[in-house]
């Protein structure tokens, strides 16, 4: 039964995606709408940098969709709006799979094995996912942002993807496969910073899922400790890693040019290769037998988040 359920789960998820995409693409804004949307459309079409703190990865992705306008800039707004529609439909897809993953834990909690799932349980899980996904599809707030060139549609997609990835890790945490999900999750978080900082709010949920998986008999004290740790992680990324990564590059550039008399961009190039060297060192360290698994995971997570950080360099030029 479990094989049939996995197939149906994938099929129903893509049905939810098609329904959402059809809804949004047929109700999408034909041109620019209010607030920041005209600015984002212009930045995507012209390769410009938007208002602080900047949304560089959003603009790069928008520029890709503007290419489908075929050089007709009058259609640029429509294509960036369509980008939001498709990413919103993608958010619905991962929302469906998230709901079914969580519902399955409740419905099948008394089953001795995964193969003990019954048809009634499978139908309950799939219908729960479809109802939840479609209710969110046609909710006023989400539908409103799904049809215009705002960062919230893209950010919602990133948020849904990140939370789904931690649930996939939770179900497959043993071995190398589980580590791959953690690495991909860290990279998506790094990229999402170039869209909107909303994605960082997933970190407390991610930390709790990780903690409960590692500590099945978790207590209140440990749960509160995990939440406090997640707050420190958010603060470190928000106030340390994001501004510090760019600020350090600027300080090295100023020292190289003003202090050492080097040509322009010397410090920036040095900093770039220095970061690459650190990442290479982390990879080399992973092959050392005396390195603990916990240290490796921390190095990999921090390094992969930094891989997404170059998209934030555009913020420094605002």
Predicted regions located by residue number:
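Extracytoplasmic catalytic/substrate-binding loops of multi-pass membrane glycan-assembly enzymes
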Residues: 28-40, 50-62
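Start-transfer (signal-anchor) and selected internal transmembrane alpha helices
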Residues: 1-23, 90, 113-130, 276-308
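Perimembrane helix-loop-helix junctions
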Residues: 170-171, 202-228, 239-268, 272-300
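Short hydrophobic alpha-helices at membrane interfaces in multi-pass membrane enzymes
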Residues: 127-130, 165, 172-190, 219-232
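Transmembrane-helix motifs of polytopic, lipid-linked glycan transferases
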Residues: 14, 82-117, 161-165
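Membrane-interface transmembrane helices that cradle and orient dolichyl/undecaprenyl
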Residues: 119, 123, 162-182, 208-218, ...
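Transmembrane signal-anchor helices characteristic of membrane glycosylation enzymes that use polyprenol
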Residues: 5-34, 136-138, 196, 234-239, ...
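Aromatic- and kink-enriched transmembrane "portal" helix at the membrane-lumen/periplasm boundary
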Residues: 26, 73-81, 109-122, 129-156, ...
């Amino acid at each position: 039964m479990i094989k049939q359920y996995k197939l149906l789960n994938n099929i129903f998820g893509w049905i939810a995606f098609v329904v959402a995409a059809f809804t949004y693409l047929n109700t999408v804004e034909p041109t620019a709408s209010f607030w920041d949307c005209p600015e984002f459309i212009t930045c995507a079409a012209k390769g410009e940098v938007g208002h602080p703190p900047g949304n560089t990865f959003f603009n790069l992705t928008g520029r890709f969709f503007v290419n489908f306008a075929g050089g007709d800039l009058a259609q640029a707004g429509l294509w960036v709006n369509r980008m939001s529609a498709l990413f919103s439909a993608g958010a619905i897809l991962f929302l469906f799979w998230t709901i079914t993953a969580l519902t399955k834990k409740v419905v099948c909690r008394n089953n001795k094995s995964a193969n003990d799932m019954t048809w009634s349980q499978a139908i309950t899980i799939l219908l729960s996912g479809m109802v939840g996904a479609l209710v969110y599809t046609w909710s006023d707030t989400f539908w409103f942002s799904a049809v215009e060139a705002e960062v919230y549609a893209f950010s919602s997609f990133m948020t849904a993807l990140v939370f789904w990835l931690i649930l996939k890790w939770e179900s497959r945490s043993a071995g190398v496969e589980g580590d791959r999900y953690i690495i991909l999750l860290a990279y998506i978080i790094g990229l999402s910073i170039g869209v909107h900082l909303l994605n960082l709010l997933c970190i407390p949920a991610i930390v709790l899922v990780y903690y409960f998986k590692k500590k099945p008999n978790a207590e209140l004290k440990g749960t509160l400790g995990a939440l406090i740790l997640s707050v420190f992680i958010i603060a470190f990324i928000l106030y340390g890693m994001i501004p510090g990564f760019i600020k350090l590059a600027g300080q090295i550039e100023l020292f190289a040019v003003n202090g050492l008399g080097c040509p322009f961009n010397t410090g920036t190039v040095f900093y770039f290769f220095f970061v690459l060297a650190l990442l290479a060192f982390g990879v080399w360290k992973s092959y050392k037998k005396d390195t603990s698994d916990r240290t490796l995971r921390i190095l990999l997570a921090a390094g992969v988040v930094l891989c997404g950080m170059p998209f934030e360099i555009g913020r420094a030029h605002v």
